[in-house]
């Protein structure tokens, strides 16, 4: 077997006149009667190879037998294509290879779907079952090439900044808070279980107490939670921790790293600092803690209308400490019919809204179901508050503040997609800061950590832990990209007494805290430095930088929405012998 000269997708005019050896898969084959053209494919792309009896009759005969997805080796001379046959759609479109020798390395059965880039309308379950074939498609091959470039850029940046890449355990202890753990039974310790890590949070804090100062890890994490388009049961995290830093230091580091990645991978220079917004401002203006700022359509408080108008829904909402907010779809009045508005009403119902009120602005006032409730002065108030003009569609939700935020926040994104308001070429990074430290869980009747129990409160709010925990703010920060939470971080608690107080507020007894987190509390007794960090979702970063819409397209062998692997049929049953060794019995 001859040595490969280069990749198929890298054969350019620089190789003109050279005899080269290529190896790859037959993407397609065209027999023109006396001449056979084959598009030969590998991970870098496609090149056209020509079988001409003038160069080799024997090679032509073999080429007559090859079919799609055969693995072949060809030798030949690189020549310039005739001007009328140049293919500007591919990198190698100026040249072709006149084949003098071909060897069939391996044959292929007819694939269950075409690998050709033009045929992508295949049921996703079929693609996942034959994932090794799906990954041959150039679109996915380029996605994973970019994933490699992104991780390489991250590693180079962190290495240059003095971070140590340190691995942490995969078999660890199950702890409360957060999503459900994936559990691993121990054979050696009867009836006891390990948990797969949801993140290396506690270990990276222990590494700071160990004195390593700067740590990072590109690490697998596991969460047994309900899936959606941007969630997987196992995912990859860029995990970072630093000692003797404050919030500003961590945010600056994260920002510089992301700018470097975007410049190296996308060729895009991001000038200036990333915009910042407090959690309260994000919720007030966008109804989301991860707002998409590529378009406007902000939420506008029009609660004044509830005090001025004789419209029972608005009036009752304000009297019961609710609020009324509106969004304006510019120029969309004619585009949305009453049937469309009914569909939008059903959409906001999903988020708890009882209804969606709306009006269309016309030259002489308002039309729509609630237009008749607006007196002249009410119309003026609405137009002044919202800036709405003739031709605009104004939508209202009147309810509790959290319902208003969630429903209108989701609606603005839906409308932006329908109206084509989103510039898909933009990369809008945003820091969301000043998060609540705690949230109240109505079902459990207790406080839970908004991020995790190891996030430090702002120094001015420490006293509130004993008096008004719901008012305490955290030294926490999330990085958002185009409406997706890319990652989050915080300055951690490094004082044992404060950590114990935090556990107490979260409803742990001293005994429970010691049993679950005693190793951390013990470590705090031996001199813990101030420390903080951030964790970024690598799969999600790749998804956004490659303009994919599904996280599964960025993971080589992903799970389905029901957390199954269609390729290997995992999860699967195990033998009675294995269960017996683990002292387990399955109840059906």
Curated annotation (Swiss-Prot):
Q: Spell out the subcellular localization from the entry.
A: Cytoplasm
Give the domain of life. Bacteria
Binding locations of ATP = 223-225, 232, 485, 537-540
EC number(s) on file: 6.1.1.12
Q: Where is this region: Aspartate?
A: 201-204
User: Where along the chain is L-aspartate bound?
Assistant: 177, 223, 451, 492
**Could you tell me which InterPro entries the record lists for this protein?**
Aa-tRNA-synt_II (IPR004364), aa-tRNA-synth_II (IPR006195), aa-tRNA-synth_II/BPL/LPL (IPR045864), Asp-tRNA-ligase_1 (IPR004524), Asp-tRNA-ligase_1_N (IPR047089), Asp/Asn-tRNA-synth_IIb (IPR002312), AspRS_core (IPR047090), GAD-like_sf (IPR004115)
Any single GO molecular-function term of the entry would be: ATP binding
Any one GO cellular component localisation term in the record: cytoplasm
Q: Which family does it belong to?
A: Belongs to the class-II aminoacyl-tRNA synthetase family. Type 1 subfamily.
Quaternary state and partners of this protein?
Homodimer.
Physiological role: Catalyzes the attachment of L-aspartate to tRNA(Asp) in a two-step reaction: L-aspartate is first activated by ATP to form Asp-AMP and then transferred to the acceptor end of tRNA(Asp).
Q: What is this protein called?
A: Aspartate--tRNA ligase
Q: Which organism is it from?
A: Staphylococcus aureus (strain JH9)
